[in-house]
């Protein structure tokens, strides 16, 4: 007897290295989204760092979290599909984990499938310095994700896994949908992002992270009065810009592929 197969429409997108799968024409509130996403992300499947589900102008992330890079990817897809798009256009979208409408400025980057997308990011709820065991971390809270800033030069810790376990323990009595740890090198303005999504029950080292870069930008503004910086990511770059007390994240987006994915039920 044949197993049933679920057929989904997908678009694979590269926002600054943070490989993202967007699933179209699907119930964005389906209860199986976390399980489906886990299957889609596998190395033996489409192989990505995160999955989002899109309908009209809304993006629903796999764990109900907010994601800046997926939002930039979604707006770039809208430009890619927009017959009226030529060089530049602004797109208003919404994303899970964030109640406000997001404004994304999309520009062509030299090819039909390549864009630069600048998103106005949500403001943080709180910014503080905390101590976790003997380590000092920055903690920037947003409505859809909590980001920890770990300065690897200052803390001199070689085991990132140890820090991840300590942060999980720190958050054990809190309600949250996702957390990130930005392992930041202050010498060369580079970072290695780790993001854990509670609903999916796993975390990944991402090749870039827009909300994490936002958190780092707010942190650097507070600590070093730095309004703008290009932050080197493991597989690309993202620039944060603070203008008139608003935070923007800018960087490249490339539409890689689209087609159908087959998932065994």
From Swiss-Prot:
Outcome recorded upon mutating residue 209 to S: Catalytic turnover is greatly reduced with D- and L-histidine
EC number: 5.1.1.24
Reaction catalyzed: L-histidine = D-histidine
Catalytic class of the enzyme: isomerase
Isomerase among keywords: yes
Alphabetized UniProt keyword annotations: Isomerase
Active site: 67 (proton acceptor), 209 (proton donor)
Note: Was originally proposed to encode a lanthionine epimerase that catalyzes the conversion of L,L-lanthionine to meso-lanthionine, the last step in the lanthionine biosynthetic pathway in this organism. However, the authors found low catalytic turnover and low catalytic efficiency, suggesting that L,L-lanthionine is not the physiological substrate for the enzyme.
Record-stated family: Belongs to the histidine racemase family.
Subunit structure: Homodimer.
Official protein name in the record: Histidine racemase
Gene giving rise to this polypeptide: hisR
């Amino acid at each position: 007897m044949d197993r049933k197969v679920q057929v989904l429409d997908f678009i694979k997108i590269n926002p600054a290295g943070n490989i993202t799968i967007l699933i179209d024409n699907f119930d964005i509130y389906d209860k199986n989204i976390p399980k489906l996403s886990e299957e889609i992300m596998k190395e033996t499947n489409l192989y990505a760092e995160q999955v989002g589900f899109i309908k009209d102008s809304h993006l629903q992330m796999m764990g109900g979290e907010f994601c800046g890079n997926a939002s930039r990817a979604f707006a770039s897809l809208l430009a890619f599909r927009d017959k009226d798009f030529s060089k530049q256009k602004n797109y208003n979208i919404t994303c899970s984990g964030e109640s406000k409408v997001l404004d994304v400025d999309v520009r062509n980057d030299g090819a039909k499938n390549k864009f630069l997308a600048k998103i106005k990011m949500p403001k943080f709820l709180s910014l503080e310095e905390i101590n976790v065991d003997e380590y000092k971390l920055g903690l920037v809270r947003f409505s859809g994700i909590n980001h920890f800033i770990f300065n690897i030069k200052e803390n001199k810790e070689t085991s990132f896994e140890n820090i991840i376990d300590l942060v999980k323990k720190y958050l054990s009595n809190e309600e949250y949908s996702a957390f990130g740890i930005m392992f930041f090198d202050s010498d060369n303005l580079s970072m290695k992002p780790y993001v854990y999504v509670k609903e999916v029950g796993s975390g990944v080292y991402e090749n870039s992270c827009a909300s994490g870069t936002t958190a780092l930008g707010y942190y650097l503004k507070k600590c070093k009065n730095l309004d703008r910086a290009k932050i080197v990511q493991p597989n690309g770059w993202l620039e944060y810009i603070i203008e008139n007390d608003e935070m923007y994240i800018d960087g490249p987006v490339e539409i890689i592929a689209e087609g159908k994915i087959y998932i065994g039920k």
